[in-house]
Amino acid sequence: CRQSCSFGPLTFVCDGNTK
């Protein structure tokens, strides 16, 4: 996943869930 979990309601879980 990318480190763009700074712009989203559930993208904060991009730690290893979202892309």
Curated annotation (Swiss-Prot):
InterPro entries membership: Dur/DurB-like
GO BP, one annotated term: killing of cells of another organism
Post-translational modification: Maturation of lantibiotics involves the enzymatic conversion of Thr, and Ser into dehydrated AA and the formation of thioether bonds with cysteine or the formation of dialkylamine bonds with lysine. This is followed by membrane translocation and cleavage of the modified precursor.
Disulfide bonds listed in the record: none
Covalent cross-link (Lanthionine (Ser-Cys)), residues: S4-C14
Lineage top rank: taxon: Bacteria
Cross-link (Lysinoalanine (Ser-Lys)): S6-K19
Keyword Secreted annotated: yes
Single GO cellular component term: extracellular region
Family designation: Belongs to the type B lantibiotic family.
Protein's name according to its UniProt entry: Lantibiotic duramycin B
Record organism: Streptomyces sp. (strain R2075)
